[in-house]
Structure formats: structure tokens, C-alpha cells
Amino acid sequence: MGNIVRKLPIGIQSFDKLRTENYLYVDKTEFIYQMAYQGVPYFLSRPRRFGKSLLLSTFKAYFEGKKELFRGLAIEKLETEWKEHPVLHFSLNAELYDSRKALENMLERQLREWEKIYDTGGEGITYSGRFMTIIRRAAEITGRKVVVLIDEYDKPLLRNLHNEELQNEFRELLTAFYTVLKDADPWLRFVFITGVTKFAQVGIFSNLNHLNDISLAPQYAALCGMTLPEIEATFQPELHALAEANKLSYEDTIEKITRRYDGYHFDFRSGIALYNPFSVLNVLSKQVFYDYWFASGTPTFLAEMLRKTNYDIRELDGIEVSEVSLSDDRANINNPVPMIYQSGYLTIKSYDERFRLYTLGYPNEEVKYGFLNFVASMYAHLPETETPFYIGKFIQELESGNTEAFLTRLKAFFADIPYELNDRTERHYQVVFYIVFKLLGQFTEAEVRSAQGRADAIVKTPRYIVVFEFKLRGTAEEAIRQIDDRGYLIPYTADEREVVKVGVAFDAATRNLGEWLIEKTL
């Protein structure tokens, strides 16, 4: 195993700490200079753990004139003045926000800290009034315009997505607080606000009509995250050590990192593909391929949203959405797709410029299989740890040609669904079938029907091709006949592997698999 002695910035959100303690850094400072030069108020939406906090910390160091921290970086050759400005840096990331009082306490602590620095005497009755006084006083004392950096502005709202009463209270508080930024414009040099999603009802969007949303802007697509050239330029020793530890070639290592952690697209013109920085740094550090980003946070609010909307998750991979739905109100509980996209579980795959339609899909294997495994536990009401056990056994049985054992285990999987869920609709069971066969795709080639004229599911192993047809209202014999009559086997006539036909009938009374037939072709 390679001996890595360089420091990887896993979880480092302070640019000052990163530079003074010699952590590796993917240089984003050219973006910093460009945005600071423009000077307009910015908003950026990106998924969690994508580098938003470090980005704001970098802006803070830049506007505080800490030139020494930027030695050797792109901005060193661009900036000549290094003017120091008062910076109000505010993160809403650290609280649970389970009550109105929790948000009030957070605002109170932050305002008191600033009031002490700028000696305002706590002037102003409301939070917004005190915030305005702080901005004005900071500009007066220093003789320089103020920089405001707000990190994870939407955290209180995301924490309470399904608590309408608390949501409304938080909106009221935050709208009044953020609206100050419009009236304080004469004293402001730069404003940058980050979050996961865009709550259009909050005042920063309804009142700050000059806020520049760069979330889908091609020129800022690579502002957060890592590109492959950046990874290869910054982490060469770590990449070679990862290859050695996993007994892979350098090329195969890059291919595996790409397959598992690449694939994020935040615009439709630049073609820039981004790697998840959290997963990349972790795999380079631990030298083990694992779903680091997905394991670092469970998308419970998305699961709750899917439950409430009864959304068909089979439509997620390849769904088309309008440009407006991604750039307007993304926190619409009646349409979970924009929120799923903003949270990082879907990404842009293509864009139809004529009709202004985005096609979305899972960015990579980590997200695809992590999300499907999580949703499987939700639909089947099984612990998340049990689904991988089933999938592993399914694969072993199909690879050994024991289709009978596979179907018996699949029946047991359905039997484990609690009895109280047995009033689920037909679609519920179709979705469970879909999830199971999609999850098989982690380990072998598996397809689930997405169009007419194809079998319900096809699994290809080194020795077998297994073609499945399921009948919700019909017999196993009818399912086998449909495989033959519709020519589902024709694409495999020249294949040397053994082809197996499987017809399965669904038993409405037991809400489970009923009879099945297995036929092997000569």
C-alpha cells in the first residue's frame, strides 16, 4: 500500500486552516476573483458536502485582504490591491431548528457577536433592524463597504419541510432578516448566499430582485466540486497509491472513480462533469471504494416527500422537466423532482434548448444504488441493512443458474413486507420489482422494462441470460407465451450463454408471487 504523507482536506471548511496547515487544495481562486470583480449579489445552490462552506471561507479570506494565504494560487497573479473589507460571515448549518426559539437563539448569538465587534450598542428592536445597524456601522467605522456571506441559508426550512406551522414561522423570521440586504445596498460591497434549494417564498428571492442566481450558469459550473483534470493535477501520488492498494492499473482506477463519483452536471452548455469532492477525498484517503457521500447523510426528507406525493420513482431516471421548474421554486412539496435534483440525487443529463427541457438522471453508481437501496427499505419496510443481503443472495443464485432458488427468495422478500401494507396498489409492487432488478445491476447486467416490446426484466450473468415476464392478472403460462410471441429472445439467438425464460404470476390474494414456470432454451 502506498505511503501517503500529504494532507487531504476532508471536512475542512476553513480556508485559513487549509492553507496554514498545508492541506492540499483544488484551486478555485480564479472564480473568486471574477465574482468579486463583478461585485453583484450572488446565490448558489449545490448539494451538501460539495464545498460551499469552504468556498465562502475563501471569499472571507480574500475580502479580509489575507494575501499571504493565496500565495501560489491563480488569484495571486490577478489581484493587485488586496483591499480589506468588513466581512459578516453567517452560517446556519449547526442547529437542529426544532422550534422557533432555536432559530431566534441562532440569530441572537450572531447579532451579539457582530454588535460587540462594531460597538453598535444593540441598536434596533428587531433582528432585521439590528442587522441593518451592524451593516451601516461596519461601513462607517472601517470606511469600506461591507461583505455579507450567508452559508446554508435554507437549513432551518429543510429541517422542517413537513412541519407547515414551523415553516411559516421560519419564513417570517428569515424573510425579514434577509430583506435587509436590499435596503442596505449602499453599504454593501459583495453578497454571496448559498443553500441546497431555492425557497421562492423567502424574502431573498422575492425582494432581492437583483440577486444573481448562478446555480445553472455555465461559467460557474465548476465553482464547487472537482473536475477530472483538477483531480489528476492535484492528487497524483494519492491516485497511484489508490491503484496500488486495489491492485488496479492507473487507468482502471480513474475509470472506477469516474463510474462511482463523477457525473454531476450543473449547466447545459459547458459540458463540465464534476466529481463529488467528499467521496473523492475519502477514497483517496482510505484507499477503499465506498459510498462515502451517501453514507454521510440519509435523505429522510426526500423519503417523506416521496411518501406524501406518492411519486413513482421509476420515472426519476430519465425524467424531463422544464427549465422553470429547476430555476424557480424548487422546494415545492407537490413536485419532489426539483428538490431531489438540488439535493444531489439527480443531475442534468441533457438539455433541449428548443423546448427548454432538461433530462435528469442519477449522476453515478454511488448515488443510484445508494438511493435505490434507501428507497427499497422504504417501500418494503425492511431495515436498510437487509436489502443488500437479499441482493447478494439473488446474484449468487442467478449466477449459479438456480433460478428456482432466486424466485423462492424473491417470494420471501415480498413476504417480509408487513401485513398492514398489503392494501398497497398494484403500482407499489411493480415499483418493488423495479427496485430489486435495478439493484441487481450493481453486480451484473440487469435491465428493467422501460418501453413496450421488451421483457419485464432481463438479467445477464457470465453463463446465463434470464428473461422475466411478470403477470399481475394472468398465468405463468401466459407470461411464457408472451416471451415467445413477442420475440423477447431474438436479440440473444447468437449469444453462447444459456437463455432461461421465466414466467411469473402475481397472487392477488397473498399479495406475493404465485405460480411460476422456468424454461431453458436449447
For each feature predicted by the language model, list its residue ranges.
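C-terminal amphipathic alpha-helical interaction region
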Residues: E445-A451, A457-T461, Y492
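A short acidic/basic microdomain associated with nuclease active sites
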Residues: Y434-S450
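Metal-dependent nuclease catalytic cores in nucleic-acid-processing enzymes
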Residues: F177-A184, P338-L346, Y434-L439, Q482-V502
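Domain-level recognition of nuclease-like catalytic cores that cleave nucleotide substrates
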Residues: P491, R497-L522
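Feature representing long, continuous alpha-helical segments
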Residues: T408, R427, V431-I435, R481
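Mg2+/Mn2+-dependent nuclease catalytic core
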Residues: Q167-E172, L472-L489
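Conserved catalytic cores of phosphodiester-cleaving nucleases, focusing on short active-site segments
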Residues: F433, A455-L472, R486
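Phosphate-binding site recognition
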Residues: M1-T425, L440
